[in-house]
């Protein structure tokens, strides 16, 4: 992360005028001789990889090829030293490929610094991560290992070459005893939001495949931008971890930026509730957290504002201070922080707490251990569930802005008596439901209608907002997606040129900022498997894009050669274009997106705190205003669909 002064400068520019800051920035010129050597090395490694595609350790080799390929093709060598590092990666990748060809994979049994990779569900790209494997590790040892996830700070030049090389040289800030430390790449520099958030969970799942993990001793830690990552991940997924230790960073957008001139749109103000950790402070009731700051570091602001929000929830934030220091750890503070964190880790996570305090603003984040919010009364208003197991046959819960809730206690939870029915007090209403099963598990689903709670029926076929199907537009890029390229003639030339430009930009930006090659197919090539497994990003209009033509009649927008109609509003089709997210009428378990990639643009690149969702569920873009580094054009209308994916007269304000 950049120093605060530079971050504030970026915000000022962002507020006053569009700023075009490319990320990554253009690299240095690579001498022709080095280019030839690197290309030859890539070709040799690619030839070896061809015969290894079915090997389960294929990603552990492929990541070396991708790292060098991206740096070379994308002009992403930023220092002369990186050219040497790239050659080293090709050498190591070649050695690993040769080992796999012999049926060996020695790095899978190694201790110390190990780099590995996995294939992401989002775009099929290989993503790297680093490990510090303790010297006590052995594949034959019957032991479940504590895992500390470490989130790195910001570096605009942190390409895969630097990440992999550094992870083979540098053990990092903390190396707890008998602990596997997982160093996340996080798909570059995004403070673990969007695809960067998914990277953490995918990398952790990959670690689980290869190492025995103690599920009750997983911790999240990081510094600077990595501290921001920890605040985000921990606040939204509090009961997944034993402890959190954020250092510096940021915890929200507007107060961190301290720019009174910047006035967000009404929908941006609502969308901040997606990513602001401050809005989820109540969830730290479930998770021990210790914040670190240098006493002279302006980025103490993150912990200061989290402490304020936690105080409003009746909690006092534990803090460790580095004395007479700015943006760094002191040796003494590291010792104290390690002592405290290790004590919490030794105790481990309370897997099945009797009491849950949970807040959310969206069904994207709908679970806090055994409490699951299935439906909201209104997205982007605060929802709460305070639930408690009173005794072995009764549960009490109080809710706000919740339309449906489930209680799901898994095997061995054993909080309720299997020989007794359970009485549930839900917002003062008493309901008697079947008791726990003999494995200790218990599940009950409730839905509110006309102010009254009742046991809920299965409504899987009902069109409504639900977890992972709630928007906004950016949500489509947290799971498998395919960009669907139009092959027909556009309804209007201006719109056709704009959609092509925006599609090209989205593909380019995905590679640069989220480090993958966006899957792209012609509209004539979309298969049943694509419909079943992926969100479809439809570019063009109902005439140019055959898939869009198939679903158009079932969307809450009408689009002809003359007009775009959104409820009671009409926009000229010659100079307007809709962007939106909606359940795919051909497979309502997946999304379609019309004419949009992820929604923050270049003006957000000055500070990771600006890298947030910029557009809601839908918008109409006026193309008489050209795209800039903030918007795809003038936003003539925008809004959120209702809880049944219906168009609201208020636009969801």
Could you say what each language-model-derived stretch is?
Residues 17-61:
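Amphipathic, heptad-repeat alpha-helical segments
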Residues 18-28, 74-145:
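A domain-start/cap signature at the N-terminus of enzymes
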Residues 136-142, 193-225, 235-241, 283:
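Gly/Ser-rich "nucleophile elbow"/oxyanion-hole loop immediately N-terminal to the catalytic nucleophile
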Residues 144-211:
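Active-site machinery of serine-nucleophile hydrolases
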